[in-house]
Amino acid sequence: MKKKVFTVAVSLLTILLLVACGNNKKSTDTSSSEIPKTSSSQKAEQSSKTIEFSTTAIDTVIYEGKGVTLTYKGLEKDDYEYTLKLAYKNTSNKEYEVQTRNGKVNNISNNDNHKIIICSDTLKASATSEGSIKLPINALEAASITKPKVLECNLEVIYDITETVAKIPIKVTFE
């Protein structure tokens, strides 16, 4: 008798625990003909054409949208690197990252053997800031590039690590 009471009590307790851990959300009708919207992480705003400019074209607006403006401010060169200076204006209430992807200099791709393009800047919410795209001279030399002539890459504006907000293809001619 005690065994049966114990088994029934454990069974009831198990059922109560399963009900308590169940999904509290209302179910959705999957037979609806409505097509779900694509999230912005899957569909970033992409410039339809490549933004082309030379290193002498100071104050070139590269991108303007989603509360963010990216502007090219000039080229600096020292013994260690070429630096393409950028200015950022973020009028949104979100913090973004700007990074380069699929980059190449003089048609030589950026890869693990030679990191010829470096860019990772943070844009604080409702702020202006400065950043840069750097081309380290030792990495350029390792890739057999004596002088950069053309930089091609995508500048990507990223929110919350995974959501690409904008993808801007650029082509910069060094003069």
List PLM regions with ranges.
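C-terminal motif of bacterial Sec signal peptides marking the signal peptidase cleavage site
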Residues: 17-20
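Short, solvent-exposed loop/turn segments enriched in Ser/Thr/Gly
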Residues: 79-85
